[in-house]
Regions:
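One face of beta-strands
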Residues: 1, 34-38, 50-52, 75-83, ...
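Flexible loop and strand-edge segments within Gram-negative outer membrane beta-barrel domains
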Residues: 1-51, 55-76
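Short glycine-rich beta-strand segments
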Residues: 3-7, 57-59, 100-102, 144-145, ...
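Short, flexible helix-coil linker/hinge segments at the edges of structured domains or between repeats
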Residues: 9-22, 65, 70-71, 96, ...
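Edge/loop elements at the starts and ends of beta-strands within beta-rich repeat scaffolds
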Residues: 43-49, 87-90, 131-136, 167, ...
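Phosphate/ribose-recognition catalytic cores of enzymes acting on nucleotide-derived substrates
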Residues: 56-58, 73-75, 82-92, 98-105, ...
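Surface-exposed extracellular loop regions of Gram-negative outer-membrane beta-barrel proteins
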Residues: 92-103, 107, 116-147, 276-287
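Exposed, low-structure sequence patches enriched in small/polar residues
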Residues: 137-141, 145-384
Length: 384
Protein backbone atom coordinates (compact mmCIF):
# COMPACT_ATOMS: atom_id res chain seq x y z
CA UNK A 1 0.00 0.00 0.00
CA UNK A 2 1.10 3.58 -0.61
CA UNK A 3 -0.36 7.08 -0.53
CA UNK A 4 -0.28 9.89 -3.07
CA UNK A 5 1.80 12.15 -0.84
CA UNK A 6 3.03 14.30 -3.74
CA UNK A 7 2.23 18.00 -3.91
CA UNK A 8 -0.66 18.96 -6.22
CA UNK A 9 0.37 20.75 -9.42
CA UNK A 10 -1.84 23.57 -10.70
CA UNK A 11 -2.80 24.26 -14.28
CA UNK A 12 -0.96 27.34 -15.68
CA UNK A 13 -4.28 28.74 -16.92
CA UNK A 14 -5.32 29.17 -13.30
CA UNK A 15 -4.21 32.05 -11.09
CA UNK A 16 -5.36 30.31 -7.90
CA UNK A 17 -2.83 28.51 -5.72
CA UNK A 18 -3.66 24.92 -4.82
CA UNK A 19 -3.58 24.14 -1.11
CA UNK A 20 -2.08 20.68 -0.40
CA UNK A 21 -4.31 20.28 2.66
CA UNK A 22 -7.37 20.43 0.39
CA UNK A 23 -6.38 17.13 -1.24
CA UNK A 24 -6.15 13.55 -0.03
CA UNK A 25 -2.49 12.78 0.66
CA UNK A 26 -3.04 10.17 3.37
CA UNK A 27 -5.38 7.44 2.10
CA UNK A 28 -3.48 4.31 1.13
CA UNK A 29 -3.97 3.07 -2.40
CA UNK A 30 -3.70 -0.71 -2.75
CA UNK A 31 -2.43 -2.31 -5.94
CA UNK A 32 -3.19 -6.01 -5.63
CA UNK A 33 -1.61 -8.65 -7.85
CA UNK A 34 -2.49 -12.35 -8.10
CA UNK A 35 -0.47 -14.43 -10.54
CA UNK A 36 -0.41 -18.06 -11.62
CA UNK A 37 1.98 -19.67 -14.10
CA UNK A 38 2.61 -23.16 -15.43
CA UNK A 39 4.86 -24.33 -18.22
CA UNK A 40 6.88 -27.05 -19.86
CA UNK A 41 10.19 -26.82 -21.71
CA UNK A 42 12.56 -29.20 -23.48
CA UNK A 43 16.25 -29.50 -22.70
CA UNK A 44 18.37 -26.84 -24.36
CA UNK A 45 20.25 -29.22 -26.68
CA UNK A 46 17.24 -31.37 -27.68
CA UNK A 47 16.96 -32.10 -31.45
CA UNK A 48 13.40 -30.79 -31.31
CA UNK A 49 12.97 -27.96 -28.84
CA UNK A 50 9.73 -26.75 -27.38
CA UNK A 51 8.40 -24.33 -24.78
CA UNK A 52 4.88 -23.63 -23.59
CA UNK A 53 4.07 -21.23 -20.75
CA UNK A 54 0.57 -20.39 -19.57
CA UNK A 55 0.00 -17.43 -17.27
CA UNK A 56 -2.74 -15.46 -15.58
CA UNK A 57 -2.47 -12.10 -13.83
CA UNK A 58 -5.22 -10.42 -11.83
CA UNK A 59 -4.30 -6.80 -11.08
CA UNK A 60 -6.52 -4.24 -9.40
CA UNK A 61 -6.48 -0.73 -7.95
CA UNK A 62 -8.53 -0.47 -4.77
CA UNK A 63 -9.47 3.15 -5.58
CA UNK A 64 -9.81 5.29 -8.70
CA UNK A 65 -9.07 9.01 -8.10
CA UNK A 66 -10.45 9.14 -4.57
CA UNK A 67 -11.38 6.76 -1.78
CA UNK A 68 -15.02 7.31 -2.74
CA UNK A 69 -14.45 5.65 -6.14
CA UNK A 70 -13.67 1.99 -6.69
CA UNK A 71 -10.81 1.21 -9.03
CA UNK A 72 -10.70 -1.09 -12.08
CA UNK A 73 -9.49 -4.70 -12.27
CA UNK A 74 -7.44 -6.15 -15.12
CA UNK A 75 -7.37 -9.85 -16.04
CA UNK A 76 -4.49 -10.92 -18.30
CA UNK A 77 -4.33 -14.35 -19.94
CA UNK A 78 -0.91 -15.05 -21.43
CA UNK A 79 0.44 -17.84 -23.67
CA UNK A 80 4.13 -18.04 -24.64
CA UNK A 81 5.40 -20.70 -27.01
CA UNK A 82 8.40 -21.79 -29.04
CA UNK A 83 8.96 -24.77 -31.35
CA UNK A 84 12.28 -25.36 -33.09
CA UNK A 85 14.25 -28.13 -34.76
CA UNK A 86 17.96 -28.71 -35.29
CA UNK A 87 19.33 -29.68 -38.68
CA UNK A 88 22.61 -29.73 -40.56
CA UNK A 89 24.74 -29.74 -37.42
CA UNK A 90 24.60 -26.33 -35.72
CA UNK A 91 21.51 -24.92 -37.42
CA UNK A 92 18.01 -24.42 -36.04
CA UNK A 93 14.75 -23.18 -37.46
CA UNK A 94 11.84 -22.25 -35.25
CA UNK A 95 8.72 -20.28 -34.50
CA UNK A 96 8.14 -18.49 -31.21
CA UNK A 97 5.63 -16.00 -29.96
CA UNK A 98 3.15 -14.97 -27.34
CA UNK A 99 -0.54 -14.09 -27.15
CA UNK A 100 -2.10 -11.94 -24.42
CA UNK A 101 -5.77 -11.23 -23.81
CA UNK A 102 -6.75 -8.33 -21.55
CA UNK A 103 -10.18 -8.31 -19.92
CA UNK A 104 -11.42 -5.56 -17.57
CA UNK A 105 -13.90 -5.50 -14.70
CA UNK A 106 -14.99 -1.89 -14.28
CA UNK A 107 -16.70 -0.24 -11.29
CA UNK A 108 -20.14 1.28 -11.64
CA UNK A 109 -21.80 4.42 -10.35
CA UNK A 110 -25.58 4.66 -10.52
CA UNK A 111 -25.60 1.39 -12.42
CA UNK A 112 -23.29 2.73 -15.16
CA UNK A 113 -19.61 2.05 -15.75
CA UNK A 114 -17.70 5.33 -15.47
CA UNK A 115 -14.30 4.16 -16.73
CA UNK A 116 -13.33 3.12 -20.24
CA UNK A 117 -10.96 0.19 -20.70
CA UNK A 118 -11.31 -1.94 -23.84
CA UNK A 119 -11.00 -5.72 -23.81
CA UNK A 120 -8.48 -6.69 -26.49
CA UNK A 121 -5.78 -9.13 -27.55
CA UNK A 122 -2.13 -8.61 -28.46
CA UNK A 123 0.02 -11.17 -30.26
CA UNK A 124 3.56 -11.61 -31.55
CA UNK A 125 4.81 -14.30 -33.95
CA UNK A 126 8.57 -14.71 -34.38
CA UNK A 127 9.90 -17.07 -37.07
CA UNK A 128 13.70 -17.43 -36.92
CA UNK A 129 16.78 -19.25 -38.17
CA UNK A 130 19.94 -19.84 -36.10
CA UNK A 131 23.38 -20.98 -37.15
CA UNK A 132 26.73 -21.15 -35.34
CA UNK A 133 30.35 -21.44 -36.45
CA UNK A 134 33.66 -21.86 -34.66
CA UNK A 135 33.82 -18.23 -33.53
CA UNK A 136 30.51 -16.70 -34.58
CA UNK A 137 26.76 -16.95 -34.00
CA UNK A 138 23.90 -15.66 -36.14
CA UNK A 139 20.14 -15.45 -35.70
CA UNK A 140 17.89 -14.17 -38.49
CA UNK A 141 14.23 -13.59 -37.84
CA UNK A 142 11.32 -11.20 -37.69
CA UNK A 143 8.63 -10.20 -35.20
CA UNK A 144 5.11 -9.93 -36.59
CA UNK A 145 2.81 -8.16 -34.12
CA UNK A 146 -0.80 -7.08 -34.01
CA UNK A 147 -3.36 -5.58 -31.63
CA UNK A 148 -7.13 -6.08 -31.82
CA UNK A 149 -9.92 -3.68 -30.83
CA UNK A 150 -10.75 -0.10 -31.75
CA UNK A 151 -7.03 0.72 -31.90
CA UNK A 152 -6.11 -2.35 -33.94
CA UNK A 153 -2.60 -2.20 -35.38
CA UNK A 154 -0.27 -4.42 -37.39
CA UNK A 155 3.51 -4.06 -37.37
CA UNK A 156 6.73 -5.92 -38.01
CA UNK A 157 10.27 -5.59 -36.74
CA UNK A 158 13.59 -7.39 -37.22
CA UNK A 159 14.69 -10.13 -34.82
CA UNK A 160 18.41 -10.39 -35.54
CA UNK A 161 21.44 -11.10 -33.35
CA UNK A 162 25.02 -11.69 -34.43
CA UNK A 163 28.42 -11.89 -32.79
CA UNK A 164 31.89 -12.77 -34.04
CA UNK A 165 35.16 -13.20 -32.17
CA UNK A 166 37.66 -10.85 -33.79
CA UNK A 167 40.52 -11.47 -31.36
CA UNK A 168 41.21 -13.50 -28.26
CA UNK A 169 38.28 -12.87 -25.83
CA UNK A 170 37.09 -9.94 -27.97
CA UNK A 171 33.93 -9.92 -30.04
CA UNK A 172 31.83 -7.62 -32.16
CA UNK A 173 28.08 -7.93 -31.70
CA UNK A 174 24.85 -6.66 -33.18
CA UNK A 175 21.27 -6.83 -31.91
CA UNK A 176 18.29 -5.59 -33.94
CA UNK A 177 14.90 -6.29 -32.47
CA UNK A 178 11.52 -4.82 -31.76
CA UNK A 179 8.69 -5.34 -29.32
CA UNK A 180 5.06 -4.63 -28.60
CA UNK A 181 4.71 -3.09 -25.12
CA UNK A 182 1.17 -3.58 -23.87
CA UNK A 183 1.29 -0.70 -21.34
CA UNK A 184 -1.27 -2.64 -19.34
CA UNK A 185 -2.38 -1.53 -15.90
CA UNK A 186 -0.07 -4.11 -14.33
CA UNK A 187 2.99 -3.29 -16.45
CA UNK A 188 2.70 0.48 -16.05
CA UNK A 189 2.24 0.16 -12.28
CA UNK A 190 5.59 -1.65 -12.12
CA UNK A 191 7.23 1.42 -13.65
CA UNK A 192 5.26 4.20 -11.92
CA UNK A 193 2.84 3.29 -9.15
CA UNK A 194 1.54 6.88 -9.03
CA UNK A 195 0.00 6.62 -12.51
CA UNK A 196 -3.61 7.79 -12.82
CA UNK A 197 -5.50 4.53 -12.16
CA UNK A 198 -8.34 5.55 -14.49
CA UNK A 199 -6.09 6.07 -17.54
CA UNK A 200 -5.97 3.50 -20.33
CA UNK A 201 -2.82 3.63 -22.46
CA UNK A 202 -2.25 2.59 -26.05
CA UNK A 203 0.34 -0.16 -26.64
CA UNK A 204 3.79 1.14 -27.57
CA UNK A 205 5.04 -0.26 -30.87
CA UNK A 206 8.82 -0.55 -30.95
CA UNK A 207 9.76 -0.97 -34.63
CA UNK A 208 13.50 -1.03 -34.03
CA UNK A 209 15.72 -1.53 -31.01
CA UNK A 210 19.23 -1.83 -32.39
CA UNK A 211 22.61 -2.01 -30.68
CA UNK A 212 26.13 -2.55 -32.03
CA UNK A 213 29.24 -2.81 -29.94
CA UNK A 214 32.52 -4.42 -29.08
CA UNK A 215 33.19 -6.22 -25.80
CA UNK A 216 36.37 -7.75 -24.50
CA UNK A 217 37.86 -9.51 -21.51
CA UNK A 218 41.34 -9.54 -22.95
CA UNK A 219 43.15 -8.35 -19.80
CA UNK A 220 43.09 -10.49 -16.63
CA UNK A 221 40.21 -9.38 -14.42
CA UNK A 222 39.24 -6.54 -16.76
CA UNK A 223 36.19 -6.43 -19.06
CA UNK A 224 34.77 -3.64 -21.20
CA UNK A 225 31.82 -3.06 -23.52
CA UNK A 226 31.57 -0.06 -25.86
CA UNK A 227 28.19 0.25 -27.54
CA UNK A 228 25.77 2.48 -29.41
CA UNK A 229 22.20 2.08 -30.55
CA UNK A 230 18.99 3.49 -31.94
CA UNK A 231 15.31 2.93 -31.09
CA UNK A 232 12.16 3.87 -32.99
CA UNK A 233 8.89 3.65 -31.06
CA UNK A 234 5.32 4.76 -31.69
CA UNK A 235 3.28 5.83 -28.66
CA UNK A 236 6.27 5.83 -26.31
CA UNK A 237 5.27 6.66 -22.72
CA UNK A 238 6.47 9.80 -20.91
CA UNK A 239 5.28 10.56 -17.37
CA UNK A 240 4.22 14.03 -16.19
CA UNK A 241 2.10 15.25 -13.26
CA UNK A 242 -1.64 15.75 -13.73
CA UNK A 243 -2.36 19.50 -13.89
CA UNK A 244 -5.26 20.43 -11.63
CA UNK A 245 -7.72 23.32 -11.65
CA UNK A 246 -8.96 24.87 -8.37
CA UNK A 247 -12.45 23.52 -9.03
CA UNK A 248 -11.26 19.95 -8.42
CA UNK A 249 -9.96 20.60 -4.90
CA UNK A 250 -11.61 18.25 -2.48
CA UNK A 251 -11.16 14.59 -1.65
CA UNK A 252 -9.27 13.51 -4.77
CA UNK A 253 -5.70 12.26 -4.58
CA UNK A 254 -3.19 15.09 -4.64
CA UNK A 255 -0.74 14.07 -7.35
CA UNK A 256 -1.32 11.32 -9.90
CA UNK A 257 0.93 10.89 -12.91
CA UNK A 258 -0.44 11.04 -16.40
CA UNK A 259 1.14 9.30 -19.34
CA UNK A 260 1.88 11.39 -22.42
CA UNK A 261 2.31 9.21 -25.50
CA UNK A 262 4.28 10.29 -28.56
CA UNK A 263 6.31 8.86 -31.41
CA UNK A 264 9.96 8.85 -30.40
CA UNK A 265 13.42 8.20 -31.77
CA UNK A 266 16.11 7.44 -29.22
CA UNK A 267 19.85 7.34 -29.97
CA UNK A 268 22.25 6.24 -27.25
CA UNK A 269 25.88 5.36 -26.71
CA UNK A 270 27.99 4.33 -23.80
CA UNK A 271 30.69 2.28 -22.19
CA UNK A 272 30.59 -0.40 -19.49
CA UNK A 273 33.75 -1.24 -17.53
CA UNK A 274 34.33 -3.99 -14.97
CA UNK A 275 37.38 -5.01 -12.99
CA UNK A 276 37.75 -7.89 -10.55
CA UNK A 277 40.78 -8.65 -8.40
CA UNK A 278 40.82 -12.26 -7.25
CA UNK A 279 37.97 -12.61 -4.75
CA UNK A 280 38.79 -9.41 -2.85
CA UNK A 281 36.90 -6.70 -4.73
CA UNK A 282 34.90 -5.89 -7.87
CA UNK A 283 34.56 -2.48 -9.53
CA UNK A 284 32.08 -1.50 -12.23
CA UNK A 285 31.42 1.75 -14.07
CA UNK A 286 28.82 2.40 -16.78
CA UNK A 287 28.01 5.64 -18.57
CA UNK A 288 25.27 6.21 -21.16
CA UNK A 289 24.38 9.30 -23.19
CA UNK A 290 20.81 9.56 -24.52
CA UNK A 291 19.46 11.76 -27.32
CA UNK A 292 15.69 11.91 -27.88
CA UNK A 293 13.63 13.23 -30.78
CA UNK A 294 9.88 13.20 -30.08
CA UNK A 295 6.80 14.27 -32.04
CA UNK A 296 3.81 16.24 -30.68
CA UNK A 297 5.43 17.04 -27.32
CA UNK A 298 8.41 19.32 -26.64
CA UNK A 299 10.69 17.01 -24.66
CA UNK A 300 11.20 13.40 -23.65
CA UNK A 301 9.70 14.14 -20.24
CA UNK A 302 11.25 12.25 -17.35
CA UNK A 303 14.00 10.67 -19.46
CA UNK A 304 17.61 11.41 -18.44
CA UNK A 305 20.12 12.78 -20.92
CA UNK A 306 23.10 11.27 -19.12
CA UNK A 307 23.26 8.26 -16.80
CA UNK A 308 26.19 7.08 -14.72
CA UNK A 309 26.20 3.89 -12.68
CA UNK A 310 29.15 2.89 -10.51
CA UNK A 311 29.76 0.31 -7.84
CA UNK A 312 32.38 -1.38 -5.74
CA UNK A 313 32.09 -4.61 -3.76
CA UNK A 314 34.71 -5.56 -1.17
CA UNK A 315 35.11 -8.98 0.47
CA UNK A 316 37.57 -8.59 3.38
CA UNK A 317 36.80 -12.17 4.45
CA UNK A 318 34.79 -14.91 2.77
CA UNK A 319 31.72 -14.36 4.96
CA UNK A 320 31.49 -10.57 4.64
CA UNK A 321 30.71 -8.31 1.68
CA UNK A 322 30.31 -4.54 1.59
CA UNK A 323 29.01 -2.73 -1.49
CA UNK A 324 28.67 0.90 -2.54
CA UNK A 325 26.38 1.63 -5.50
CA UNK A 326 26.07 5.06 -7.09
CA UNK A 327 23.57 6.34 -9.67
CA UNK A 328 23.51 9.74 -11.37
CA UNK A 329 20.86 10.86 -13.89
CA UNK A 330 20.99 14.34 -15.41
CA UNK A 331 19.09 16.43 -17.95
CA UNK A 332 15.54 15.41 -16.99
CA UNK A 333 12.54 17.66 -17.64
CA UNK A 334 8.83 17.54 -16.85
CA UNK A 335 5.72 19.14 -18.36
CA UNK A 336 3.87 21.80 -16.36
CA UNK A 337 1.64 23.15 -19.12
CA UNK A 338 4.10 25.57 -20.69
CA UNK A 339 5.90 25.18 -24.00
CA UNK A 340 9.29 24.87 -22.35
CA UNK A 341 9.93 21.89 -20.11
CA UNK A 342 10.60 22.37 -16.41
CA UNK A 343 14.03 21.16 -15.36
CA UNK A 344 14.14 18.54 -12.62
CA UNK A 345 16.86 18.00 -10.06
CA UNK A 346 19.44 15.39 -10.91
CA UNK A 347 19.08 11.96 -9.36
CA UNK A 348 22.21 11.64 -7.24
CA UNK A 349 22.03 8.56 -5.05
CA UNK A 350 24.57 6.50 -3.13
CA UNK A 351 23.48 3.24 -1.48
CA UNK A 352 25.38 1.03 0.95
CA UNK A 353 24.81 -2.71 1.32
CA UNK A 354 26.40 -5.15 3.74
CA UNK A 355 25.98 -8.92 4.06
CA UNK A 356 27.24 -11.53 6.51
CA UNK A 357 26.90 -15.23 5.73
CA UNK A 358 26.27 -17.37 8.79
CA UNK A 359 26.10 -20.71 6.96
CA UNK A 360 24.72 -22.24 3.76
CA UNK A 361 21.16 -21.49 4.89
CA UNK A 362 21.19 -18.23 6.86
CA UNK A 363 22.75 -14.81 6.56
CA UNK A 364 22.36 -11.19 7.63
CA UNK A 365 21.60 -8.30 5.28
CA UNK A 366 21.68 -4.52 5.76
CA UNK A 367 20.99 -1.84 3.15
CA UNK A 368 21.07 1.94 3.55
CA UNK A 369 19.67 4.02 0.69
CA UNK A 370 20.62 7.59 -0.20
CA UNK A 371 23.38 7.81 2.40
CA UNK A 372 24.37 11.25 1.03
CA UNK A 373 20.87 12.53 1.95
CA UNK A 374 20.37 14.07 -1.48
CA UNK A 375 16.97 15.60 -2.31
CA UNK A 376 15.47 14.91 -5.71
CA UNK A 377 12.23 13.83 -7.35
CA UNK A 378 11.90 10.61 -9.29
CA UNK A 379 8.46 11.90 -10.35
CA UNK A 380 7.66 15.62 -10.19
CA UNK A 381 5.98 16.63 -6.94
CA UNK A 382 7.23 13.57 -5.06
CA UNK A 383 10.37 14.58 -3.12
CA UNK A 384 12.56 11.69 -2.02
Amino acid sequence: AFNYYGLPVYSPESSVTLVPENFDRETNQVNQTIQAKIGVESKEDAPVGYLLDLGYTNFSHKYALSKEQDGPTEHTFDVKFDLNARFGGEQRIGLGGNVEYFNYSLPTMGGQEYLEFENHAEATLSPYYKVSGDNWNLKLGANIMFVTGDNSKFMASPNITADVEVADKTELYLVAGGKLYSNSMYEISQVNRYINPTMELLPSRNYLDGTVGIRSGIAPGFWFDVFGGYKITSDEVFFAPTLLAPSVQGDIFANTSRALQANAKHAFGGVNLKYSYQQLFDINLKGVYNSWNVDDIEDAYGKPEMELTAGITVRPISQVTASLDYYLATGRKTFLGRSEGEKMKNINELNLTGTYTLNDTFGLYLKLNNVLFQKYELYYGYPM
